[in-house]
């Protein structure tokens, strides 16, 4: 994140000698109460001396558990919090995969702690439409705003013949690529798809036999992912898993390239993807394979929407610029935050 100044804070070693460390951090942590533990960690953080004499006009936190540190910085400055999904869901999932000493913190307990802290804010900013809708219901008394995050744009050309999937190795991406290789790729034999990103290692670990069958499609980690988008004639978004906004989907939108995608790729966005002229929406593997095979036989470069000039003015590019560009983010944040600092 760009910043004019950066300061770092952490808990001093002396905190371990305090009884409050054991009661507010250690005890909740061993029972899986990450919500209370992480909030206590920021409460005990030692703030830099250089900030002591500064006047704080506004505090923008990117997680609810930063609120104690924010209030140590200023007890009165307007406080804006980005919710970053329902953290209680993430904590509950984390507890599924680790050893937790009973009694384990329940989802309801984790959520109540999260909401307790969020009620301290003056404004809640939600980064996707699903999240915004959720918190409108959970905290209807709060001021809730939908502001999509700024996502770095991908190049819009010159385009080419390549059909690509871009995917990192997180679990939802791995499952989505697995679905594509099991159910779509065998039905589209003319499509020579290139899969860029470190999803190759994740799939190899999860499904070695499937990876071996299709390993010729994988490029692995690519230093210049922009070049992948720039030279693509068609981008695939075979998304079947995940929640919250898909950053890879936003990157693909910004490239302006023709897309074949599942509805799940557009999760968290207030848009009907069927209204985007350069998007072919497919709700099942058969439809995805049919669209992909037809595009491969025709040749991606023959699509009039695949050239650099067409990509610059495509529907997905316009949607990106209006919602996910740095200018769009700055404008929306300014409009909702300005009343807090001028009241």
Question: In which residue ranges do the predicted regions lie?
Answer:
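Acceptor-binding helix/loop patch of EC 2.4 sugar-transfer enzymes
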Residues: 10-37, 77-112, 274
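Acidic donor-binding loop of glycosyltransferase active sites
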Residues: 122, 230-244, 255-257
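Donor nucleotide-sugar binding/catalytic pocket of nucleotide-sugar-dependent glycosyltransferases
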Residues: 104-107, 115-154
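Short N-terminal targeting/anchoring amphipathic segment
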Residues: 48-66, 78-80
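A charged, aromatic-enriched C-terminal amphipathic alpha-helix characteristic of glycosyltransferases
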Residues: 155, 303-338
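Short hydrophobic beta-strand element within catalytic cores of glycosyltransferases
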Residues: 248-252, 258-265
């Amino acid at each position: 994140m760009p910043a004019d100044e950066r300061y770092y804070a952490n808990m001093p070693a002396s905190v371990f000698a305090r009884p409050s460390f054991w009661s507010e951090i250690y005890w909740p942590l061993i029972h899986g109460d990450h919500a209370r533990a992480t909030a206590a960690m920021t409460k005990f953080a030692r703030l830099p001396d250089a900030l002591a004499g500064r006047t704080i006009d506004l505090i923008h936190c990117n997680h609810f558990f930063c609120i104690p540190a924010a209030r140590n910085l200023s007890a009165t400055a307007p406080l804006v919090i980005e919710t970053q999904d329902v953290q209680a869901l993430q904590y509950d999932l984390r507890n599924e995969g680790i050893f937790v000493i009973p009694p384990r913190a329940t989802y309801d307990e984790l959520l109540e702690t999260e909401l307790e802290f969020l009620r301290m804010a003056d404004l809640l900013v939600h980064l996707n439409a699903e999240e915004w809708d959720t918190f409108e219901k959970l905290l209807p008394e709060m001021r809730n705003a939908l502001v999509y995050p700024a996502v770095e744009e991908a190049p819009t050309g010159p385009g080419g013949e390549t059909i690509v999937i871009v995917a990192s190795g997180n679990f939802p991406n791995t499952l989505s690529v697995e679905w594509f290789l099991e159910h779509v790729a065998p039905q589209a034999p003319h499509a020579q798809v290139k899969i860029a990103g470190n999803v190759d290692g994740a799939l190899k670990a999860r499904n070695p036999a499937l990876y071996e069958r299709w390993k010729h499609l994988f490029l692995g980690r690519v230093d210049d992912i922009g070049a992948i988008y720039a030279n693509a004639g068609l981008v695939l978004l075979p998304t079947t898993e995940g929640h919250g906004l898909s950053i890879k989907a936003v990157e693909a939108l910004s490239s302006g390239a023709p897309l074949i995608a599942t509805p799940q790729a557009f999760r968290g966005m207030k848009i009907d993807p069927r209204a985007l002229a350069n998007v072919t929406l497919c709700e099942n593997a058969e439809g995805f394979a049919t669209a992909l095979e037809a595009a491969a036989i025709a040749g991606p470069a023959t699509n009039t929407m695949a050239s650099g000039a067409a990509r610059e003015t495509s529907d997905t590019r316009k949607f990106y610029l209006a919602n996910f560009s740095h200018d769009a983010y700055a404008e929306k944040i300014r409009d909702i935050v300005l009343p807090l600092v001028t009241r």
